[in-house]
């Protein structure tokens, strides 16, 4: 493996490199199928101006290539580690580097997932490398495409202005969220498990949305238990609050339904202060779940006595001028029974998104909409022809020549 190092500044590169992976990591077989091997860098800096030097290529007769990243600023942090914005000194390209502490005993599930993903509405992995600290802690660095905004910040922006988000943006963002979910659920078999406005990146010029942060993502296997204490509180599906361990990708659909409601309202629909409080907030809107609905979420709770509360009509939650299609879609996504929630692909053909299929649809500034109909064959595999005809409007069919429509 190539020797790589860290340089404190462009003029004085440190010569100390790490020539090989630690012994325990030889079993990890980490390979980047974009012709980029996971290399190791020595050092751990995210301070502004810090330069990280790594090597890519060198396989299948490919020339080795040195890439240097200069850390610019921290853009996010959490229990996982830190995300910082960096610039590639060779190309001038801005990237995001997510740095996570790596347990040497295990493969990194996020890296494995990211390598499978290739979609216009999912953030892409460019490269990855390892770095070590003085204490010999190992960090995995995921070099990702940089997208400057988040849906969370866009919501805050409109709140500050005391305005409702223009409906065209609500439709655009929600459509792209469900297109990303349809892809990861149907094509990859992965459940994201942490859909929330902070994990939805937005390009403020094109309004293209990209799903990010696959740190909680997992392939759900029928019959295999999963942890229920995942997903951020306001967006947690009720079956997770009930402690279900055999849930499905419908938990992402619930979360995305909560995001849609928040885009329409300007604030979270279910702002619970704790797990139990979260359930109370849901019951206040959906009413007390029936015995049958409880059984669908977690059979262990069917005997539990819940306060009997009537459902609050959806049209009273949203203002009078709210389009009925918007209210209808929210009601189809936020169902207690996971199997009754609209699947991500079915959601894309909902009438709420018909405006996006209009050949004359434009952004408020007159620009074209971002690409919405450039489906790849695997995205629509097994989809009935009449549904495909709805998903790919006539004016966009040249983007999918493989369809033969």
UniProtKB/Swiss-Prot annotation:
Active-site residues (renumbered): 194 (proton acceptor)
Source domain of life: Eukaryota
Cite the post-translational modification comment. Answer: Autophosphorylated mainly on threonine and serine residues.
Fill in the subunit field for this protein.
Binds to KIB1.
For this protein's source organism, the top of the classification is:
Eukaryota, Viridiplantae, Streptophyta, Embryophyta, Tracheophyta
UniProt-listed PROSITE patterns? PROTEIN_KINASE_ATP, PROTEIN_KINASE_DOM, PROTEIN_KINASE_ST
- Domain annotation Protein kinase: ranges: 69-353
Q: Which organism is it from?
A: Arabidopsis thaliana (Mouse-ear cress)
**Which positions does the record annotate as the modified residue Phosphotyrosine?**
229
Task: Please verify whether the record's keywords include rRNA-binding.
Answer: no
Give the UniProt family note: Belongs to the protein kinase superfamily. CMGC Ser/Thr protein kinase family. GSK-3 subfamily.
- What EC number(s) is this enzyme filed under? 2.7.11.1
Reaction it catalyzes: L-seryl-[protein] + ATP = O-phospho-L-seryl-[protein] + ADP + H(+); L-threonyl-[protein] + ATP = O-phospho-L-threonyl-[protein] + ADP + H(+)
Q: Which gene encodes it?
A: ASK1
Output the CDD domains linked to this UniProt entry: STKc_GSK3
Q: Which Pfam families match?
A: Pkinase
* Tissue expression from the record: Roots, shoots and leaves.
User: What one GO molecular function would you report for this record?
Assistant: protein serine kinase activity
Keywords of this entry: Acetylation, ATP-binding, Kinase, Nucleotide-binding, Phosphoprotein, Serine/threonine-protein kinase, Transferase
Q: Which residues bind ATP?
A: 75-83, 98
Top EC class of this enzyme: transferase
Q: Does the keyword Transcription apply?
A: no
Function summary: May mediate extracellular signals to regulate transcription in differentiating cells.
Q: Where is this region: Disordered?
A: 1-24
- Stated name of the protein: Shaggy-related protein kinase alpha
Signal peptide range equals: none
Report the residues modified as N-acetylalanine: 2
Return one Gene Ontology term, BP aspect: meristem structural organization
């Amino acid at each position: 493996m190539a020797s790589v190092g860290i340089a404190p500044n462009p003029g004085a590169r440190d010569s100390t490199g790490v020539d090989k992976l630690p012994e325990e990591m030889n079993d990890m077989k980490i390979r980047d199928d974009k012709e980029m091997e996971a290399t190791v860098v020595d050092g751990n800096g995210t301070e502004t101006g810090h330069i990280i030097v790594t090597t890519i290529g060198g396989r299948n007769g490919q020339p080795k290539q040195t890439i240097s990243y200069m850390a610019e600023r921290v853009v996010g942090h959490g229990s996982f580690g830190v995300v910082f914005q960096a610039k590639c000194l060779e190309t001038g390209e801005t990237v995001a580097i997510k740095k996570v502490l790596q347990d040497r005993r295990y493969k990194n599930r996020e890296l494995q997932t990211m390598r499978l993903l290739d979609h216009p509405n999912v953030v892409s992995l460019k490269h990855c490398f390892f770095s070590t600290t003085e204490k010999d802690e190992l960090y995995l660095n995921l070099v990702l495409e940089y997208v400057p905004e988040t849906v969370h910040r866009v919501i805050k922006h409109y709140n500050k202005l005391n305005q409702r988000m223009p409906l065209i943006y609500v439709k655009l963002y929600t459509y792209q969220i469900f297109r990303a979910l349809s892809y990861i659920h149907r094509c990859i078999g992965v459940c994201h498990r942490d859909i929330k406005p902070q994990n939805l990146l937005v390009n403020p010029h094109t309004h293209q949305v990209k799903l990010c942060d696959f740190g909680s993502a997992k392939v759900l296997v029928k019959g295999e238990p999963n942890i229920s204490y995942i997903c951020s509180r306001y967006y947690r599906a009720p079956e997770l609050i009930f402690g279900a361990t055999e849930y499905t990708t419908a938990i992402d659909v619930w979360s995305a339904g909560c995001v849609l409601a928040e885009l329409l309202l300007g604030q979270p629909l279910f702002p619970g202060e704790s797990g139990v409080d979260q359930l109370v907030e849901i019951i206040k809107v959906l009413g007390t779940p029936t015995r049958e609905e409880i059984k669908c979420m977690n059979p262990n709770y069917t005997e539990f006595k819940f306060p009997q509360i009537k459902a609050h009509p959806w049209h009273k939650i949203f203002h009078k001028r709210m389009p009925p299609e918007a209210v209808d879609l929210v009601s189809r996504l936020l169902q207690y029974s996971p199997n009754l929630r609209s699947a991500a692909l079915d959601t894309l053909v909902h009438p709420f998104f018909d405006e996006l299929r209009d050949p004359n649809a434009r952004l408020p500034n007159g620009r074209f909409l971002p690409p919405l109909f450039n489906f790849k064959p695997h995205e629509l595999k097994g989809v009935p022809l009449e549904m495909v005809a709805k998903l790919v409007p006539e004016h966009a069919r040249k983007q999918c020549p493989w369809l033969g429509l």
